[in-house]
From Swiss-Prot:
Residues 26-158 form the RDD domain. One of its GO terms (cellular component) is plasma membrane. The keyword Transmembrane applies. The chain crosses the membrane at residues 35-55, 66-86. Its main location: membrane. InterPro entries: Pra-immunoreactive (IPR051791), RDD (IPR010432). It holds the Pfam family RDD. This is Uncharacterized membrane protein YteJ. It comes from Bacillus subtilis (strain 168). Keywords: Cell membrane, Membrane, Transmembrane, Transmembrane helix.
């Protein structure tokens, strides 16, 4: 840089400028919806590749006569809940979120996802979201959080998309 002392004085440089703090962009309703549909397909595949053949080989009934819950439906529910809980705890994202470049983060700064947070978010949150209209909250929330996100202090963000 070629400048004279007088030119530098006239520019009135006060010191290094602060870098703008960039944060991850929140994931909206539709991208989360498509990620969930992809996860649902993965779980459907797991159940049809592992659980269904196991029940067939062991000659166990997949339905029960009088009761709402059969051993098969309970097993598929366990696969469903375990998939979301384990993937979120260990990878902060499910396969659907990986494909769409999303991840689950804690709202608290530099806070890791604890087992209690993940269990609540993914297990209890799945029951809250059974009332589909409650999931619409994601579309209208400024931080794009669902009811389960608000209660668990989490949110879903884009991995490689930032906002100022």
């Amino acid at each position: 840089m070629d400048a004279t002392y007088e030119e530098l004085e006239r520019n009135d440089i006060k010191g290094p400028q602060e870098a703008e703090l960039l944060t991850h962009a929140y994931a909206g309703f539709w991208v989360r919806f498509w990620a969930f549909l992809l996860d649902w397909l993965v779980i459907w595949g797991l159940n049809h590749l592992l659980v269904s053949p196991l029940f067939t080989v062991l000659d166990l009934p997949k339905t029960s006569g009088m009761f709402t819950f059969s051993a098969y439906s309970v097993t598929t529910l366990i696969v469903y809940l375990a998939y979301f809980a384990l993937m979120t705890k260990y990878f902060r994202q499910t396969l659907g979120k990986m494909v769409f470049g999303l991840k689950v983060v804690s709202v608290k700064q530099d806070s890791k996802l604890t087992w209690s947070t993940v269990i609540f978010r993914e297990v209890v949150g799945r029951y809250i979201d059974k009332i589909w209209i409650l999931y619409i909250v994601v579309a209208f929330s400024p931080t794009k959080q669902g009811i389960h996100d608000y209660i668990a202090d989490t949110t879903v963000v884009h991995e490689k998309l930032y906002r100022k």
